[in-house]
Amino acid sequence: MNISFENKVALVTGAASGLGLATARAFAESGASVVLADWNEKDTQSAAMELANKGHKTLAVRCDVSNDAQVEAMVKKTVSTFGRLDAAYNNAGIQNVLADTADTTREDYDRVMGVNLRGVWSCMKFELQQMRKQGSGTIVNCSSLGGLVGGAERGIYHAAKHGVIGFTKSAALEYASRGIRINAVCPGLIWTPMADQMVAAGQGEALKMMEKSIPMARVGRPEEIADAVLWLCSDAASYVTGQSISVDGGFVMR
């Protein structure tokens, strides 16, 4: 994409792999100074070093987004290092253990909600505190196809992703007149380490069936989500806020 983020600062959570890493690379290649945040410190450092070796300005931060103190420290480190925060992609997320609603556990509920919903809330809270000081900024939250439809044995994950859309719309209303735009992306079936985990867990056939139900008849690439995120964060989307953009090969239009 021919979008420039020169002299801008971008923060990406879940940046050690998958959608987060692809988006961090895209921001860097578009000229942004990029903060890569993830709980996996080793892989985050490696990703940041990969970009730095190509001449990009990067910062690696270890952050568990379910920990408010770590999220606050992440945003403070971003600002103390680069002076501001212009764009944020709140991408960190995990899957739930497959189970009917009656068989789910409180432990799994708390674990998934802590990262996928509370984590997004916490990131937005501290990002917005900085952005309202500046009077500008853009945030993109990672929801999912699961934020638009139901999913058997995935109730916790889908509930969290529905919640992300609710937070996105509410915060967008609060900040629309203050120079801050907030949107969400809803990825469909994208080949990422999370998809690899599903195959390893014996869900390979389910993935194949999902692929067959995609009108475009293929699995998406992480870079296609990164393109959507960068567009939403750019001036090209200056009149877009509170939206949940599906990037799913047409799955939800069936």
Indicate where each model-derived feature is located.
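Short C-terminal tail/terminal secondary-structure segment
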Residues: 2-4, 95-98, 149, 230, ...
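Active-site helix of classical SDR
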Residues: 124, 160, 168
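Alpha-helical segment proximal to the catalytic Tyr-Lys
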Residues: 129, 173-177, 238
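Residue(s) in the substrate-gating loop at a strand-loop-helix junction
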Residues: 144
